[in-house]
Amino acid sequence: MATYAVGDLQGCLEPLQCLLEQVAFDPARDRLWLVGDLVNRGPQSLETLRYLYSIRDSLVCVLGNHDLHLLAVWRNVERLKKSDTLREILEAPDCEELLQWLRQQKLMHYDEARNIAMVHAGIAPQWSLKKAQKCAAEVEEALRDDNLFDPFLDGMYGNDPAKWDSDLKGVTRLRVITNYFTRMRFCTSDGKLDLKSKEGLDTAPPGYAPWFSHKERKTRDLKIIFGHWAALEGHCNEPGIFALDSGCVWGGAMTLLNVDSGVRLTCDCDAQGRTAALSPDPLPAPAKR
């Protein structure tokens, strides 16, 4: 049995299928981990969701900001944007079945045997593993509880508060937790977020740094797989941290990681998120701990 992790799909099914074919992925035997942003911007959001649902017993997903946005639009608490490619899902006869499944997915996955976590954007540097798990569970409960679902989605959007405080309550508390897990790139060492900067590692505002680079980060003994940050092109040069968003939907590539060996495979994509070429990753696998 092999376990593979793949970066942001964003509705690009063709490159995913190309990668899985190359590693002879067998859902009866292997496991597939996905870092979130399963849908949106790409040309095959509905087909992607249907495929993932068909292999759900072999799948571990964490939710990304685009997945949460889809749920919010579905529940009529947010409107479609011009750049969204979600309408086909919302009009599909199996929309209810697919999105009821989607709302059951995790915000954070932790594999104790491997001591490795998977999230969409990152883990707040001031959180321990135990604290991160507890915070993720709070949002997961809100997503799965019919009485909490719509109020959470309605209050989910926004950049404030910019920093975690254990005294936060209600939807404000859930919003900052969600922003850490699904939107974070740069922050201060005590977790104050900058949610505007989206470029490479050297573009941090003064006083800020990539979330994973803070020396005080409490999860330094934990290996972490994440996506979300396309400008990193799948590499962050941090031991034990595996960046997998390589910008497929923007004409970059989709990246697959063998979770145990660290070997990567990339599928180059065109500007429409379709397969262009397949190649082994030219960079060495990230260092293991």
From Swiss-Prot:
Q: List the keywords (alphabetical).
A: Hydrolase
**EC assignment:** 3.6.1.41
If you read the UniProt record, what top EC class would you report for this enzyme, in one word? hydrolase
The entry lists its GO molecular-function terms as: bis(5'-nucleosyl)-tetraphosphatase (symmetrical) activity
The keyword Hydrolase belongs to this UniProt entry's keyword annotation: yes
What InterPro entries does the record tag this protein with?
ApaH, Calcineurin-like_PHP_ApaH, Metallo-depent_PP-like
Reactions mediated catalytically: P(1),P(4)-bis(5'-adenosyl) tetraphosphate + H2O = 2 ADP + 2 H(+)
* Purpose of the protein: Hydrolyzes diadenosine 5',5'''-P1,P4-tetraphosphate to yield ADP.
| Family affiliation | Belongs to the Ap4A hydrolase family.
Q: What is this protein called?
A: Bis(5'-nucleosyl)-tetraphosphatase, symmetrical
Q: Which organism is it from?
A: Pseudomonas fluorescens (strain ATCC BAA-477 / NRRL B-23932 / Pf-5)
The organism's taxonomic lineage, starting at the top: Bacteria, Pseudomonadati, Pseudomonadota, Gammaproteobacteria, Pseudomonadales
Q: Please state the gene responsible for encoding this protein.
A: apaH
